[in-house]
A protein has these predicted regions:
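Structural secondary-structure packing elements that flank or coincide with functional cores
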Residues: 183-184
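Repeat-based blade/solenoid architectures
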Residues: 109-114, 173-177
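Eukaryote-biased detector of low-complexity, proline/serine/threonine-rich segments
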Residues: 187-189
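Conserved beta-strand position repeated once per blade in WD40 beta-propeller domains
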Residues: 59-61, 115-117, 177-180
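Beta-rich carbohydrate-recognition and catalytic domains
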Residues: 1-59, 64-109, 120-171, 191-209
Length: 209
């Protein structure tokens, strides 16, 4: 099994501040024990599109495509301060190349887009992400750090998602960072956080669940 994750190193920037720089790494294991790849990280600032932040570059979701290649989507913050989702491709899971900016926020839905997931379902392509600092829009997006489901078509030439429909996934204040798994019987199963960091103080620390 191949595991992909965000690795963090501290770096002194040009303005003198020390920041956590985010890169992507992989490990190989059997589902229980994993060994880090000795050439980590596999994706760094040099693999980012122009203007993308190396401080906000996290949460890879990896899958194997029908063409035999590995793909992953990663949350990113562009120069405008909002969110975007980057698409990468690899033949072997260890050497990766940038493919496209799959989707751009353009300051419509919150700021940084985290924890992306991307898959095909019933003939449409679905992008899930968890935007930070969302503002209400009608009856939608009242939970601040929330959830977003974008449904549309994937342009095979530009590898960009053509948005057709967009809505929140859950209306509670604690649902965040949802991810899906494809079950052997074809079901797409979603899991997510049960506790948002903004509301942690409202829960008893000695709860039995």
């Amino acid at each position: 099994q191949l595991l992909m994750y965000t690795s963090v190193n501290q770096e002194k920037l040009e303005d003198g501040t020390v920041r956590d720089i985010q890169t992507q790494a992989v490990a190989v294991g059997d589902g229980k024990d994993y060994e880090k790849y000795d050439k980590n990280p596999v994706l760094t600032a040099k693999d980012l599109p122009k203007g993308a932040s190396k401080v906000d570059f996290r949460d890879p979701k990896i899958w194997k495509g029908n063409d035999g290649n590995f793909y992953c989507v990663i949350g990113s913050r562009p120069a405008d301060g909002s969110g975007q989702i980057l698409l990468y491709r690899s033949k072997n899971g260890f050497e990766w190349e940038f493919v496209s900016i799959l989707a751009k926020n353009q300051n419509r839905y919150g700021k940084m887009w985290e924890c992306p997931d991307f898959f095909e379902l019933d003939g449409k392509y679905v992008l899930l992400t968890s935007p930070q600092d969302m503002l209400p829009e009608g009856l939608e997006f009242h939970n601040g750090n929330g959830t977003l489901c974008i449904i549309g078509e994937l342009d095979p030439e530009t590898h960009t998602l053509k948005e057709q429909f967009c809505q929140g996934v859950d209306y509670g204040i604690d649902y965040y960072a949802m991810q899906t798994l494809l079950a052997p019987d074809g079901r797409r199963i979603m899991i997510a956080w049960m506790q948002n960091w903004d509301t942690i103080a409202h829960r008893c620390s000695d709860s039995k669940w």
